[in-house]
Design a protein with these regions (language model features):
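Radical SAM enzyme [4Fe-4S]-AdoMet core and its adjacent flexible, acidic
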Residues: 1-13, 52, 73, 78, ...
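Disulfide-bonded cysteine motifs in exported proteins
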Residues: 52, 56-59, 264, 326-329
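Conserved alpha-helical substructure of the radical SAM core
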Residues: 2-149, 160, 164, 168-172, ...
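Residue-level signal for alpha-helical context at structural boundaries
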Residues: 101, 108, 136, 192, ...
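Local cysteine-cluster metal-coordination motifs and their immediate loop/turn environment
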Residues: 58-66, 289, 329-336
Length: 343
């Protein structure tokens, strides 16, 4: 199954307007100019933004702050009124919106209404789910919402393997939910959402890669993608999750048996120019690796997004990236510069 999908690509490009295209050109140009000059130059506003629907999750995945309940920041749900206000600010230039950061999006009761609102502004929408809440009704409502992309986590093809990473999860619920989505997409004769399984490759499941591909074909999803896993204590790998399949790992084994990151840690990062994250309570953080929102660029309850995007604190953070990315804590285990997706 190929990762390229023509319908999805056409759908994404259909969201482009002259204003969004010009904004994207400005953002891309300023990023490359910053790389070349080693000075932080920021033109335009984000092409893509991630909103956090909630910090809550029903699972206990061993490498996830939400699953481990290890946040020090407040937990809660994104509110519809606040989301609507933010979209009204961002929509003219915003092309791509992801509804995930931490937590399970479907636990927010307003989640699909948020999708509908973003879709009404002709923004491409995507979300990632563990698949446990794709009931028949939720599946129908998901297709009707106009959601453009649905990523379903499938980290094993048998319950015993699946639950080694998705602790507390039920594979049968994921498969049933997937069947519901595929059914309603056909029943409503809809081209969206583009549905694919995301298979997070860890040592317990790496022997099931081909089985997962066959399962994807059988269920009727549009594709499957293998994702390399982020391991927090990768040097020692106490949970024994780093796969032996080295091309599907972000880490390599050293002669002493410990691991190191494959990341060359070059002093630049595309994310800082085009794709920030907004937490459920309105904090703007630089990227999705700031799980605990330690690097707060601003609070949308006090300032507009464009004020925060252009303020000195954000510019200074970009400057630090360009001077010494390895010295920034959230960059130490970042995927910018290493292989994230495998074939």
């Amino acid at each position: 199954m190929t990762n390229f999908n023509l319908n999805d690509t056409i759908n994404l490009f259909s969201k482009l307007s002259i204003r969004r295209f010009w904004n994207g050109t400005l953002v891309l140009s300023s990023y490359y100019l910053s790389k070349w000059t080693r000075k932080p130059i920021q033109w335009g506003v984000p092409v893509s933004i991630s909103f956090e629907p909630t910090t809550s999750c029903n699972l206990r995945c061993p490498e996830c702050p939400s699953g481990l309940r290890s946040f020090t920041r407040p937990r809660g749900m994104l509110e519809m009124n606040f989301f609507r206000q933010m979209i009204d600010q961002l929509a003219p230039e915003l092309l791509y919106l992801t509804f995930y950061f931490q937590g399970e999006p479907y636990l927010n009761p307003d989640f699909l209404e948020m999708v509908k609102y973003a879709v009404s502004k002709k923004i491409y929408t995507a979300t990632s789910t563990n698949g446990h809440y794709l009931t028949d009704e939720n599946a129908r409502m998901t297709v009707e919402s106009g959601l453009d992309r649905l990523i379903i986590s499938l980290d094993g093809t048998t319950q015993d393997v699946y639950s080694q990473y998705r602790v507390g999860g039920e594979l049968e619920k994921v498969m049933s939910g997937t069947a519901n989505i595929v059914k309603w997409k056909k029943k409503l004769n809809s081209n969206t959402p583009y549905i694919f399984f995301q298979f997070l490759v860890v040592r317990p499941n790496e022997h099931q890669l081909m089985e997962a591909k066959e399962l994807a074909k059988k269920t009727g999803v549009d594709g499957i993608r293998y994702k390399t896993a982020q391991i927090y204590n990768y040097a020692n790998d106490p949970n024994h999750l780093i796969p032996q399949h080295t091309t599907l790992s972000r880490y390599r084994k050293k002669t002493d048996g410990s691991y190191e990151s494959k990341n060359p840690m070059q002093n630049h990062c595309w994310r800082l120019w085009h794709s920030p994250v907004i937490t459920w309570d309105g904090l703007v953080v630089p990227c999705c690796f700031d799980k605990d929102a330690k690097h707060r660029m601003g609070d949308l309850k006090n300032k507009s997004f464009k004020e925060i995007w252009k303020q000195p604190e954000y510019l200074d953070f970009r400057r630090k990236i360009l001077k010494g990315r390895a010295e920034i804590d959230i960059c130490a285990n970042c995927s910018e510069g290493v292989k994230v997706w495998g074939d």
